[in-house]
Amino acid sequence: MPLVVAVIFFSLWVFALGQLEQPEISISRPANKSAHISWKASIQGFSSKIIHWYWQKPNKGLEYLLHVFLTISAQDCSGGKTKKLEVSKNAHTSTSTLKIKFLEKEDEVVYHCACWIRH
């Protein structure tokens, strides 16, 4: 069974200082399985922040996927991939997780996560 590799790169785009923890830089999962991509941010007021997820295909710009505000996906702009993508947020652990279901070759991209903080 072929493996689908998801290359993960997280960006903490903030206008204030924050710290980002990445448990895995890249992951490999079998095709048609699921992958969970998580990041933890040490930023004040994480529970009230909107977390945005993007992907970047080779030689392309960033493409918006979806965002989460409280605990579940609030917006899905993934071009009909609603059943494929889920995002969650855990305010107690300051973690956001993107779940990609039914992995296929086109999912081998760089994933970005972002949070904007206003002063």
Swiss-Prot record:
Glycosites: 32
The entry's keywords: Adaptive immunity, Cell membrane, Glycoprotein, Immunity, Immunoglobulin domain, Membrane, Receptor, Signal, T cell receptor
Keyword Signal: yes
Domain called Ig-like: residue spans: 23-119
Subcellular compartments: Cell membrane
Biological processes annotated in GO: adaptive immune response
UniProt function note: Probable non-functional open reading frame (ORF) of V region of the variable domain of T cell receptor (TR) gamma chain. Non-functional ORF generally cannot participate in the synthesis of a productive T cell receptor (TR) chain due to altered V-(D)-J or switch recombination and/or splicing site (at mRNA level) and/or conserved amino acid change (protein level).
Transmembrane segments: none
Protein name as it appears in the record: Probable non-functional T cell receptor gamma variable 11
Chief subcellular location: membrane
Signal among keywords: yes
Record-linked Gene3D superfamilies: Immunoglobulins
Record's signal peptide: 1-18
InterPro entries assigned: Ig-like_dom_sf, Ig-like_fold, TRG_var/const_region
Subunit structure of this chain's protein: Most probably, the gamma-delta TR is not assembled due to incorrect folding of the gamma chain. Gamma-delta TR is a heterodimer composed of a gamma and delta chain; disulfide-linked. The gamma-delta TR is associated with the transmembrane signaling CD3 coreceptor proteins following the stoichiometry: a single gamma-delta TR heterodimer associates with one CD3D-CD3E heterodimer, one CD3G-CD3E heterodimer and one CD247 homodimer forming a stable octameric structure. Upon activation, gamma-delta TR complex associates with FCER1G to initiate intracellular signaling.
GO cellular component: T cell receptor complex
